[in-house]
């Protein structure tokens, strides 16, 4: 059970219970006790952004009605693959998601919602329910739980005042005054935590440059591992908060995968771990486990088509080029940032680091094996987070079912920087990621049956994603725009506020 001690979420503190135990009566009590008159239903549309439906609480009966029944919405305006002739959907609030809107002048309670069809059944093709189905299939087929967390990268843009300039492309973990937006990031982190986000840390990132009188500073907020459905909710809310606070303070914010040539693009790396009975299955005897290697094998197999969920506009493929802090080839390795799937440091040495650093300590007994994850490095924030998490969950389940999974993992493992000249022969043997949305759609077409297995992704949704990717007509676009600064700027402007 999640701890309620020192929670940043106002409802957890007031109700003295974890969010996953909230009931309708709890929500009503908090609203009445705090004199709240406004309620927002929020839900991610097909573009992955949060949509909002506002309510004013007329009386207690009306509050009970909307909490119990939800409300109608036009599904064809939210999802491109829903026909206008039969588009009515229900949105029904999830009480565990409750948080106070940090931007509303009038006290407003927000609730994330699930979609239901006319028959009162979950909408099969909604991204949120697709992720739910993926997690349920994973649990049913493996007896384990799929958990995840994201590293959310973004650029903050403001006028360049010329004071304490940071070194170009050397902004990683920089401090003030060379990093200009630490306070903005801290305020974002607080609001995200108050909305239920479980944050690991935040810091400035590599990207830091000036252009045309503007300062571009890259930042990252990283979360803690949790059930994948919660992880997707947290990332979706986080993007909404970062954008809103930026707008409030007069700062421009972009999650775009690439905003100029030669500078670090922004990714959305996803860390994963597999749990059973509350125990992390990614390590065994201090080394990466067979379970982890099999899950990685699934990602190696499905890597080309995972881009269909994780890299959803043409600028995504301007980021996936060599020497730009982004992967290009299908491989994995330990502590290796040139690979697609990285196994980061996981505190596997069993050394009491705290005692060594602090001689006055008697020793700690923290179970560090719970911390090990594996990281998929190709996605970016153009992704619909729910579909991306669902795709990764499917890939890990698929890997666990492969008879030759361990062999696949062995064949795709590398322990060198694959982009160095001396490793050119090795690089030539590795499969490459798609170079366009068009190519990504082709990869999805070839591998779609894996995603449709167990009814996780609906055929209509796969068709819709492929059509959306093909519509960009970007088969040769990467080669074209890299030769033209004007074409590059036009493309970046088009997708500047993606995701």
In which residue ranges do the predicted regions lie?
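Histidine-centered divalent-metal-coordination microenvironment in nucleic-acid enzymes
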Residues: 112, 151-165, 207-222, 256-278
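Active-site capping/gating regions of soluble enzymes
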Residues: 17, 25-32, 37-47, 51-119, ...
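Eukaryote-specific, cytoplasm-facing alpha-helical/coiled-coil scaffolding segments in long proteins
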Residues: 323-325, 414-422, 466-475
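Membrane-targeting and insertion segments and their boundary/processing signals
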Residues: 13, 162, 166, 212, ...
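ATP/Mg2+-dependent ligation/transfer catalytic cores
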Residues: 1-208, 226-240, 251, 387-388, ...
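Short, local alpha-helical segments
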Residues: 224, 370-376, 419-428
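Generic beta-structure capping elements
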Residues: 224, 275, 344, 486-488
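Intrinsically disordered, low-complexity charged/polar segments
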Residues: 407-437
């Amino acid at each position: 059970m999640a701890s309620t001690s020192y929670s940043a979420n106002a409802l957890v503190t007031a109700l003295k219970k974890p969010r996953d135990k909230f009931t309708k009566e709890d929500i009503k009590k908090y609203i009445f006790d705090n004199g709240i008159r406004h309620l927002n239903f929020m839900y991610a549309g097909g573009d992955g952004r949060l949509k909002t439906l506002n309510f004013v609480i007329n009386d207690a009966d009306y509050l009970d009605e909307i909490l119990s029944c939800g409300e109608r919405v036009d599904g064809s305006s939210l999802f491109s693959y829903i026909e206008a002739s039969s588009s009515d959907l229900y949105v029904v609030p999830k009480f565990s998601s409750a948080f106070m809107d940090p931007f509303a002048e009038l006290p407003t309670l927000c609730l994330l919602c699930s979609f239901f069809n006319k028959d009162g059944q979950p909408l099969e093709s909604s991204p949120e329910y697709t992720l739910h189905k993926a997690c349920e299939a994973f649990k049913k087929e493996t007896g384990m739980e799929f958990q995840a967390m994201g590293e959310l990268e973004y650029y903050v843009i403001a006028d360049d005042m010329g004071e304490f300039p940071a070194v170009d492309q050397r902004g990683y973990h920089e401090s003030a005054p060379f990093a200009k937006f630490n306070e903005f990031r801290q305020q974002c982190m607080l609001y995200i935590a108050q909305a239920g986000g479980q944050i690991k840390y935040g810091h400035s990132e590599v990207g830091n440059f000036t252009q045309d009188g503007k300062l571009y500073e890259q930042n990252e907020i990283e979360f803690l591992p949790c059930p994948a459905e919660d992880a997707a909710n947290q990332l979706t809310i986080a993007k909404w908060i970062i954008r809103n606070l930026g707008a409030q303070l007069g700062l421009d914010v972009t999650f775009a995968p690439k905003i100029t040539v030669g500078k670090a693009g922004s990714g959305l790396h996803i860390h994963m771990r597999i749990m059973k009975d509350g125990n992390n299955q990614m390590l065994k005897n201090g080394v990466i486990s067979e379970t982890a290697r099999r899950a990685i094998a699934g990602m190696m197999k499905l890597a080309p088509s995972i881009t269909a969920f994780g890299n959803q506009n043409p600028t995504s493929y301007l980021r996936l080029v060599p020497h730009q802090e982004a992967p290009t080839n299908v491989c994995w390795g330990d502590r290796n940032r040139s690979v697609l799937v990285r196994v980061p440091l996981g505190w596997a040495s069993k050394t009491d680091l705290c005692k060594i650093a602090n001689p006055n300590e008697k020793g700690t007994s923290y179970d560090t094996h719970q911390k090990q994850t594996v990281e998929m490095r190709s996605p970016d924030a153009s992704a619909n987070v729910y579909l991306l998490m669902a795709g990764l969950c499917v890939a890990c389940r698929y890997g666990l079912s492969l008879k030759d999974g361990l062999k696949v993992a062995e064949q795709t493992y590398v322990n060198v920087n694959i982009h160095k000249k001396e490793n050119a022969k090795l690089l030539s043997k590795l499969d490459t990621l798609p170079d366009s949305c068009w190519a990504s759609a082709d990869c999805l077409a070839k591998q779609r049956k894996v995603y449709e297995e167990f009814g996780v992704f609906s055929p209509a949704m796969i068709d819709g994603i492929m059509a959306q990717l093909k519509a960009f007509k970007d088969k040769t676009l990467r080669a074209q725009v890299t030769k033209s600064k004007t074409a590059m700027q036009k493309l970046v402007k088009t997708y500047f506020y993606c995701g």
